Amino acid sequence: MYILVWKKGQQIKTFHTLDEAAQFKAASNIDEAQMFSVTVASAISASGGSTEATNLRRLMYLSKSTNPEECNPQFLAEMARVAFIRNREIRVSGFLMYSSPFFIQVIVETDEDLDFLFAKISADPRHEMCIVLANGPGTGRMYGDWHMKDSHLDSITTHTAMKTILYQIARSFSSMWIYLQKSAANMLMLGKDPAAQPPERRSVVVTFIYLVEFCSIFSHPNLTEKTADVLSTFVYVCVKNVEGSGGNIAKFIPAICMTYWPIIRTKEALTAIQQISEDLAQLRSQQAQGSAVSLRYSQAGVHYGRGMQCNAGSRKSDFTLLGDCINTTSRIATLAKKLKTPLLFGFEVRCLLGDEKREEIEGAGIHQVKGRDKPVVVYQFPGPDLDVAMVRQKIEQFTPGRFRCQMPVVEYEALPISQRPPIFDDTPKSNPRPRTPGYGGRQRSDSLVDRLIRIANLSGFSESATGDTTLTTLTYISQATRPMSRLDLSAIMPTATRRNAQQSNIGTVLHENGLFVQTLEGPKDAVVNLYLRIRQDPRHTDVTTVHMAPLQERVYTSEWTLTLATEEMLATFPPVQDVLSQLAKSYTSLETYVPSTVVRYLTAGNNPRNLMPVSCGVVMLATDISSFTSLTEISSFTEVWMICNTFIDACTSAICQEGGEVIKLIGDCVTPYFPGNNADLAVAAAQELFIFCRQLREAFVDVLDVRGCVSCAVGMDYGQVVMAQCGLLRLSDYVAAGAVSAGVVEVEAITREVGYQFVVTVPDADRVQPQFRDYGIEPTPQAIGGLPCYGIVREVFDLPVESIKRGIKAMHAARSGEQPLTEPEQAKPDFRVSPGRDRHGVSGRRSNSSQGKGSIQVG
């Protein structure tokens, strides 16, 4: 059974199937509505006893008060009294706790009643932003006959530590939740760690929705400051129509929305994309003169295929779809631009449509696209063309008039240092780190640890109160590596107290059920140095920073050199243990999915919604696995996931180690950026990645493992980007958008054609530092946006695509027991290039390593 709730919970209707609910919603033109699945089970077991205990479900949620000033203990008690009377009638149990400005509530009830009750609770105007922390089966009623036990945190404890810890974790968690992809959020709600889930095969309809000519909008001198407005409205329209039709937003790539639907909703997918185009047209017609919103048009490509939903990466993660169907969809969307159509879809999508819908479509021809040996058959709906040249001309003729945008973009360098968003980690390094990335390891790195290590290296591990003495607070959470007894906890205190007294640090540490939560206060250098020591303690792992910010005055009294908070503190209200544990566990998982800039801004005590849109110059990389399509054709889904996970982990490790920021993970493609004045860091990260791939091949080539065929290519470009927050309260993203975002992917794509593993553009060649001048560069026949490109010339940087493909085929033949290839040179996966080999498309040219001349030196 399905329940449809709208009009803020006042209108409710039940349906037997999801399609019935969706059809009613569409026919009634209901925009703001929620659907809930309800499982109806018998209340009497076969033996005649009650089955309530086995049908119970436990839901914990976090929300924010709309009027924190009135939420005193008396107000909360009245809320609980009314809830108690209502819940006793329907046999609901649980508790409600308030820690300004957050409500935390747990409800235990049978499946058929819980969704209905939560729908009404979500519509209550006294709170907003209801985020489910846990939603799973319960083994019984944990809170007995508490039909609604209430407590204001002030009534639970006067302990400052508990109030501070709960507030900081709840604030950080609620702020980061909106950046989480829906599928990963559902995992967390069920109490599962997305990173620990095995890959799941799915048949999906994938779409790429493009904002037409965004690069032209960005490049126009009168439109750069309006870029954030354009992106934000585009995201809003996409989210409204995709999620409203049963689809899922996979991710936002600058000016591109990647989405997917289950195959039973193919018709809804096409309808939603058409509605996005119509909504943008309506918005264009309503805009005042000089509004950049009048320049927004959308184009989309749709394709059906088998994909794999899984977690990719560990240091920076993405719960995403993998599979060749993703790449094909992107190519079809690009083809839509050439064919001047707003919506283009493949033959497989046409087969999923009903007879009525098929009569409306028309063929758009057979076309060859990149990455596929066979051509694709595409279709479109009849209608007016969408001429990209017309849109470009409209942009070029744009005059701003007197219209003022809501989120003006400002120059990053023009802002005072204190007002600049933390898009770079500008702390200088005292000692160069080794050029080989570290992979794996016991300790999980959080998003602040690199900055903290650099600060510590500059200041030294001095026990004196020298250096930066700014009063600072830092809160972290971690998990114990083994059970901790009272004796173990007591043994921590004397050493910690003595050490903290020497460094003027005070604070508290809470241990409950394997969870450590510690807050430190003191001079900044002393707090940072202590935190770095604590991270190395083998008694805990998964150390994650929750909050780090300057203080005006100490929260804890001077007598608290270190206070241990345990069960005694929570004895008056045991459910706090449950709340704290669930919040900390979810936060640890959530932090890896959120952009690093947002995490840094948030942990400094700021609201990410206040991040100012800025424009700046960056060096950007794009890298992916060479011949990935060929690899996927001979690999199982599990092997594809393993290859991507291994490669993405290597990329993020190398990039973060060199001071770069990972923007997006798109299938097997990783796109980071580096400071515009430090291209050598990007080159160093690329070197580390090449070394990793070579070592990986050498390790697995003799055991017929697909990892023995992994090679990669890197493109590097320089340009201006706008970094801005865009989206809604329920789904948001922090993007780096600009012409370079798309251009660097094109630079990387030509590596296959020219036979170089590393290709750069002219601006990047000018920015590379002297230590890389021993690498000559050679012009390529292709140019990107009028800019010539150059390949880095060394034999180890050659990319023999045909040799890689032969190696993949040879490995597949060996694994399947087929006869080896007849040509000896084809039987062995050779990833090196013999001196003198002619490159594809570079007739007559040879590498600098073989000729010793004819190259351009970097510098």
Swiss-Prot record:
Region annotation Disordered: where it falls in the sequence: 420-444, 814-859
Keyword Repeat carried by entry: yes
Domain BLUF intervals: 56-149, 471-563
Domain of life: Eukaryota
GO cellular component: motile cilium
GO molecular function, one term: blue light photoreceptor activity
Keywords of this entry: Cell projection, Cilium, Flagellum, Repeat
InterPro entries (alphabetical): A/G_cyclase, Acylphosphatase-like_dom_sf, Adenylyl/Guanylyl_Cyclase_3/4, BLUF_domain, Nucleotide_cyclase
Repeat is among the record's keywords: yes
Listed GO biological process terms: cyclic nucleotide biosynthetic process
Compartments where located: Cell projection, Cilium, Flagellum
Biased composition (Basic and acidic residues): 825-841
Cited Pfam families: BLUF
Polar residues biased stretches: 845-859
Assembly information from the UniProt record: Heterotetramer of two alpha and two beta subunits.
Further facts: The ST- strain is deficient in phototaxis. It is not known if this is due to defective adenylate cyclase activity or defective BLUF domains in this protein. In wild-type E.gracilis, photoactivated adenylate cyclase is found in the paraxonemal bodies (PABs). PABs are absent from this strain.
PANTHER family hit by this protein: ADENYLATE CYCLASE, TERMINAL-DIFFERENTIATION SPECIFIC, ADENYLATE CYCLASE, TERMINAL-DIFFERENTIATION SPECIFIC-RELATED
Protein name, UniProt field: Photoactivated adenylate cyclase subunit beta-like protein ST-
